[in-house]
Amino acid sequence: MEEPQRARSHTVTTTASSFAENFSTSSSSFAYDREFLRTLPGFLIVAEIVLGLLVWTLIAGTEYFRVPAFGWVMFVAVFYWVLTVFFLIIYITMTYTRIPQVPWTTVGLCFNGSAFVLYLSAAVVDASSVSPERDSHNFNSWAASSFFAFLVTICYAGNTYFSFIAWRSRTIQ
């Protein structure tokens, strides 16, 4: 004999969660280092951002494409400005503590050292390209950008020094 077919029942369990529950920003998961900006390296990073912004906006507001050397200055200024903003966010949010696989002291030393060398070359190129005879309309902007480029170079030199001290103390341990 054939067995009678039973009715099958399906149980469906549904759960719901909101985006905010999964990615809450409680104080334990989101770190913010307010004191970093009060340190000398923090102050130098902010100065690099402000002065670097002045360098490339003063040049970008002119007809810089007529002088090929300003292309190099623009590249260095914009490239390191973006990366410095990126590093400031990493330091303020303490992201470096959540990614311990990255040797942050070495990365900081390489970044600041390369920024110092390339910004120094860009500042020298900027200063040597400024001439009132070449384009008197843009002379003041280019001269000011040259001045600020040297100030940014000094800031990167300072941060290179602090990065070297941190790197050296880290490698000695």
Curated annotation (Swiss-Prot):
UniProt-listed GO biological process terms: chemotaxis; myelination
Tell whether Nucleus is among the UniProt keywords: yes
Q: Which residues form the MARVEL domain?
A: 36-168
Q: Which GO terms describe its cellular component?
A: cytoplasm; extracellular space; membrane; nucleoplasm
**GO molecular function annotations of the record:** cytokine activity; structural constituent of myelin sheath
Mark the transmembrane ranges: 40-60, 70-90, 105-125, 147-167
Q: Where does the entry say this protein is expressed, by tissue?
A: Highly expressed in liver and pancreas.
Q: Which UniProt keywords apply?
A: Chemotaxis, Cytokine, Cytoplasm, Membrane, Nucleus, Transmembrane, Transmembrane helix
InterPro entries to which the protein is assigned, alphabetical: MAL, Marvel, MARVEL-CKLF_proteins
Q: Which family does it belong to?
A: Belongs to the chemokine-like factor family.
* Database matches in PANTHER family: CKLF-LIKE MARVEL TRANSMEMBRANE DOMAIN-CONTAINING PROTEIN 8, MARVEL-CONTAINING POTENTIAL LIPID RAFT-ASSOCIATED PROTEIN
**Which protein, by its recorded name, is this?**
CKLF-like MARVEL transmembrane domain-containing protein 8
Gene for this chain: CMTM8
